[in-house]
Amino acid sequence: MGHESPTIEFLGLTFSQSNLLMVTVASVIVFLIAVLCTRTLAMKPSGAQNFIEWVLDFVKGLVNSNMDWKTGGRFLTLGVTLLMYIFVSNMLGLPFAIVIDHNLWWKSPTADPAITLTLAVMVVVLSHYYGIKMRGFSAYTKDYFKPMAFLFPLKIIEEFANTLTLGLRLYGNIYAGEILLSLLAGLATTGFLGTIGAAIPMLLWQGFSIFVGAIQAFIFTMLTMVYLSHKVSSDH
């Protein structure tokens, strides 16, 4: 998109200020949605409560499709949080981008590989943690030598591949969408004909990007449940 992200140094590490800002914004939005949707609960839900119950039922279906509820019920909150957080993050960069002094401040946080790979690493680490916690270290390690011991190196490579593909898939789709939107926005500033030519494609692509953002949030959450089920279920 041709703009740099402002950075800050802390303890010898470099952090992107725009990433910190947008991660915070996404977190606050998800928190507010959760609070507003559960503020006044009723036996006969309506409006916002219907929405949050639909999200819960949807994620519960993802859990049940990968493992039995007794094993996977504890991951419901994780799944709901990931689904809502990633969807909100994917949407933040769609309406506009804020650039100040050639520094890009407002964007989708998931359009940065540092964010998506961090989420992926968190998911994979959690899957290993729960695998050891729920099955024991011995049963957990034996899976790396099944069905044949010589496949152990491939199992290790698979773990790294899962982490990379989980994070980079999300990043690539969201970043590509923002690149195209920025190109269309640039075309719109070239004059009257450019504005006319870019307006309809931009609206269509923004609508399609909402669909893509929702699908990517679903895929990330689904794969999270798949990876967790592989580690915590004895039949995988």
Swiss-Prot record:
| Bilayer-crossing regions | 18-38, 80-100, 112-132, 179-199, 200-220
Q: What CDD domains does its record include?
A: ATP-synt_Fo_a_6 (cd00310)
Tell me any Pfam family this protein matches.
Answer: ATP-synt_A
The UniProt keywords, alphabetically, are: ATP synthesis, Cell membrane, CF(0), Hydrogen ion transport, Ion transport, Membrane, Transmembrane, Transmembrane helix, Transport
Task: Using the UniProt record, give the first listed, main subcellular location.
Answer: membrane
Question: Topology versus the membrane, per the UniProt entry?
Answer: Multi-pass membrane protein
Q: Matching Gene3D superfamilies, A to Z?
A: ATP synthase, F0 complex, subunit A
Entry superkingdom: Bacteria
Keyword 4Fe-4S included in the entry's annotation: no
Q: Which GO terms describe its cellular component?
A: plasma membrane; proton-transporting ATP synthase complex
Could you tell me the Gene Ontology terms of the biological process aspect for this record? Answer: proton motive force-driven plasma membrane ATP synthesis
UniProt entry tagged with the keyword Transmembrane: yes
* One MF term in the entry's GO annotations: proton-transporting ATP synthase activity, rotational mechanism
Give compartment(s). Cell membrane
Q: Partners and quaternary state?
A: F-type ATPases have 2 components, CF(1) - the catalytic core - and CF(0) - the membrane proton channel. CF(1) has five subunits: alpha(3), beta(3), gamma(1), delta(1), epsilon(1). CF(0) has three main subunits: a(1), b(2) and c(9-12). The alpha and beta chains form an alternating ring which encloses part of the gamma chain. CF(1) is attached to CF(0) by a central stalk formed by the gamma and epsilon chains, while a peripheral stalk is formed by the delta and b chains.
Q: What protein family is recorded? A: Belongs to the ATPase A chain family.
The family database entries (PANTHER family) matched by this protein are listed as: ATP SYNTHASE SUBUNIT A, CHLOROPLASTIC (PTHR42823:SF3)
Reported function? Key component of the proton channel; it plays a direct role in the translocation of protons across the membrane.
Task: List the protein's name.
Answer: ATP synthase subunit a
| Native species | Priestia megaterium (strain ATCC 12872 / QMB1551)
The gene that this protein is the product of is: atpB
